[in-house]
Amino acid sequence: MSEDMEFENWGSTQSSVEKFCYKWTISNFSFCMGGIQRRITSPVFSSEENKEVAWCLRVYPKGADKESKDYLSVYLVLLSHLQIPVWAKFKFWIINSQGEKYQKIKSPTVECFLTNEQNGFKKFLPRDLLLSHRNCLLPEDQLTICCKVTILGRKYNMPSQNITPAIKDPRHLLTDDLGELWENSLFTDCCLLVAGHEFRAHKAILAARSPVFRAMFEHEMKESLKTPIKIHNLNPQVFKEMMGFIYTGKAPHLHSHSMACDVLPAADKYGLVSLKVLCEDALCRNLSVKNATHTLILADLHSTEKLKTQALDFIAYYASEVCETSEWKSILESHPHLVAEAFQSLASAQCSFLEPKVISGSNQL
């Protein structure tokens, strides 16, 4: 006969788990074959939950080494410089012409990732099989590879005395109400003129959020505030994005690289530290061979150390590709000090680079 037990105290140990998927389409794949160890690298990506950790995928169309020369090799690579390793499981598959998953292979265990270390499958798919079924696996000469990553976070204990009931967010958030004031120009008391476009706003909100606007309003005469305040050297769309952040704390269009590039100087000029950080994060996520040089110049100009470090690391990692761009060739004369810093970063990367680790995968039926 079982007996109910009464516990005077209790607790739990939990581990956070983060999951995300990334889809990568390689166009004109038949022209990317190259030789053994010739690789193709994806754009840098990260999860929505953790923008600090950057990843990329690598594909070796003719294998990562002589042993895999008849296979397609695929890898997941950790790019971020972190103080501790990242433990993660991952799964690769191909999307065929019917939109179906093909050749699903997953890591057999949780793997340890260090900076610049790659884990994956050097014998992911026989190349002859891929080419003989090109209509199905390479529609319009495009290879679409997907990777699902499961990151194991830190374990933490939850004693009973520390657990409190969750409080739901109120239905109408303060930011929504302030956003309505901005969108509908309700009860405004000032007008800002940007490239011929008038924007109605509230001095109190602008002064509370931006030290530059605060100083502007403190030193302006009452009579002059009756006329529109001219805002120079700003695009109306960029100004609108900045004002939306001032009122709501949100900047929904920073996923656009050009928008993030334009908003960053505005955030710096008007003392919007949080918006500046959001721009940094967005630009770090969108680094590419084409824009890395301009991003480095921008980061240096506006003293964004995190973005500058990421740009230097990216340039060091893709040095041969970046050096072929017209943007890089122009920086040799315009910003020689940045070229010197890039070479220092490249030298450090060469010294700390770790040999890739390969794990053998198994087909998942």
UniProtKB/Swiss-Prot annotation:
Domain BTB per the UniProt entry, residue ranges: 188-250
Superkingdom per UniProt: Eukaryota
InterPro entries: BTB/POZ_dom (IPR000210), MATH/TRAF_dom (IPR002083), SKP1/BTB/POZ_sf (IPR011333), TRAF-like (IPR008974)
UniProt xrefs under Gene3D superfamilies: 6.10.250.3030, 6.20.250.50, Apoptosis, Tumor Necrosis Factor Receptor Associated Protein 2, Chain A, Potassium Channel Kv1.1, Chain A
Cystine crosslinks: none
Domain MATH residue range list: 19-149
GO BP term, example: protein catabolic process
Pfam families per UniProt: BTB, MATH_2
Similarity comment: family membership: Belongs to the Tdpoz family.
Protein name: TD and POZ domain-containing protein 1
Species whose genome carries this gene: Mus musculus (Mouse)
Gene: Tdpoz1
